[in-house]
C-alpha cells in the first residue's frame, strides 16, 4: 500500500525528472553575409508550420467558429517566446526546450539549419552561422508581353516554390507554381487542356488559389507564363449553362466606368459559409448581391464571366498595356 508520504516523494521525483528534461539553450545566431541579424528566427520543433498544416490548411463549411479559434491561437503562437526566439543586436538568443526537441534556425535568403537539443547541449558554446543561398546575376525581360490568355479554369494545384535568388535584387513577393485545367477560353485561345504558370504574391498564398473555379488572366513574357498579379474572379457554374461571379463586379476595380450588367443569376444550390468564406477566403457579402440567414449566405446577383472580362479590359489590363482605346 502506497502511503501519503511515499506518494509525495514519488510525485516530487517525477517533477524533478520532468524539470531535468527542460534545458535553456543560449548562443549566437549569425548570417555569414552581413554584420547584423535582421530576419533570424529560432523556432521550437517548427511549431508554426505544423500548427498551420494541422488546423488552418483547409477549413470545412460549418466549422467557422473552430477555424476562428485556431486562427487566434496561431496568432498567439507566432508571438509566443516559448516557441519562437529572435536574436538581439549582438546576435544572442535564448530559448527553453526539452531534450527530445529540435530547434529550427532560419533567416531570409539563407539556408535553414535544424539541430537536436540533445546535440546542442554537448557544445561548450553555441554559434550557428547561416550560409547565404547561392545567387545568380539578374536577367531582366525587356520585351512586352507576347500574349495574354483569359480563361475559366479549375484548380489542380498551387504550391509554394523557392524563387531564384538574384545577387543584386531583393524580392518582396513569394513565388508559387500553379497548375489549372482549362474549362473555357475567353481570350487568347490557349492551346491545351491544362496550363502551368508562375504567380507572385506579396501577401502570401495567392487569393485565387482559395477557389475551385476562377477566371484567370495569364500573360507570356520572354517565353514564360505568369499570372497577371492579383487579377482574378472566383466564378461558379450557373443553371443556364454559363459561368458567373456573385457580388459587386467592381469590388476589385472601383474606378471602372463601363456599363456592366448586374443581374439576378441562377446559381442553383450554391451557398457560402459566412465565417469560413468571409475570413479564410476573404469574401465580402453585401446586399443586394447576397441573402444572409445566420451563417448561410445565398448568392443572388452578380455578373457573367464575359462582363467581368470587360471590366478588366477597361481598367487594370488597359493600364498594363494590353488594350488600346479602340479595343
Where are these regions (language model features)?
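Basic, polyanion-binding surface patches
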Residues: 134-232, 316-320, 324-326
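Short Pro-Gly-centered beta-turn/loop motif in secreted/extracellular proteins
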Residues: 94-102
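A short, amphipathic beta-strand motif
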Residues: 23-31, 66-69
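Netrin-like (NTR/C345C) domain of secreted extracellular proteins
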Residues: 213-327
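Glycine-centered loop-to-beta-strand initiation motif
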Residues: 27, 83, 87-95, 128
Amino acid at each position: 500500500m502506497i502511503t501519503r508520504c511515499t506518494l509525495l516523494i514519488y510525485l516530487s521525483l517525477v517533477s524533478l525528472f520532468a524539470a531535468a528534461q527542460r534545458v535553456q539553450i543560449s548562443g549566437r545566431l549569425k548570417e555569414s553575409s552581413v554584420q547584423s541579424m535582421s530576419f533570424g528566427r529560432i523556432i521550437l520543433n517548427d511549431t508554426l508550420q505544423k500548427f498551420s498544416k494541422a488546423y488552418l490548411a483547409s477549413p470545412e463549411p460549418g466549422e467557422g467558429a473552430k477555424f476562428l479559434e485556431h486562427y487566434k491561437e496561431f496568432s498567439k503562437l507566432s508571438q509566443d517566446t516559448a516557441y519562437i526566439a529572435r536574436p538581439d543586436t549582438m546576435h544572442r538568443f535564448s530559448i527553453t526546450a526539452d531534450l527530445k526537441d529540435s530547434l529550427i534556425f532560419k533567416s531570409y535568403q539563407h539556408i535553414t539549419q535544424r539541430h537536436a537539443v540533445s546535440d546542442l547541449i554537448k557544445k561548450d558554446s553555441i554559434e550557428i552561422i547561416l550560409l547565404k543561398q547561392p545567387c545568380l546575376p539578374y536577367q531582366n525581360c525587356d520585351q512586352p508581353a507576347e500574349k495574354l490568355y483569359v480563361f475559366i479554369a479549375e484548380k489542380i494545384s498551387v504550391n509554394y516554390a523557392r524563387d531564384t535568388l538574384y545577387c543584386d535584387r531583393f524580392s518582396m513577393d513569394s513565388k508559387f507554381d500553379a497548375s489549372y485545367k482549362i474549362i473555357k477560353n475567353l481570350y487568347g485561345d490557349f492551346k491545351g487542356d491544362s496550363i502551368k504558370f508562375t504567380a507572385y504574391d506579396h501577401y502570401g498564398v495567392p487569393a485565387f488559389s482559395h477557389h475551385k473555379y476562377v477566371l484567370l488572366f495569364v500573360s507570356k513574357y520572354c517565353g514564360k507564363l505568369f499570372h497577371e498579379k492579383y487579377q482574378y474572379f472566383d466564378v461558379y457554374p450557373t443553371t443556364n449553362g454559363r459561368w458567373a461571379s456573385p457580388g459587386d463586379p467592381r469590388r476589385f476595380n472601383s474606378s471602372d466606368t463601363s456599363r456592366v450588367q448586374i443581374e439576378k443569376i441562377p446559381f442553383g444550390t450554391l451557398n457560402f459559409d459566412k465565417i469560413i468564406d468571409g475570413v479564410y477566403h476573404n469574401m465580402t457579402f453585401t446586399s443586394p448581391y447576397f441573402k444572409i440567414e445566420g451563417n448561410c449566405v445565398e448568392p443572388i446577383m452578380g455578373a457573367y464571366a464575359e462582363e467581368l472580362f470587360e471590366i478588366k479590359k477597361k481598367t487594370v489590363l488597359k493600364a498594363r498595356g494590353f488594350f488600346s482605346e479602340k479595343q
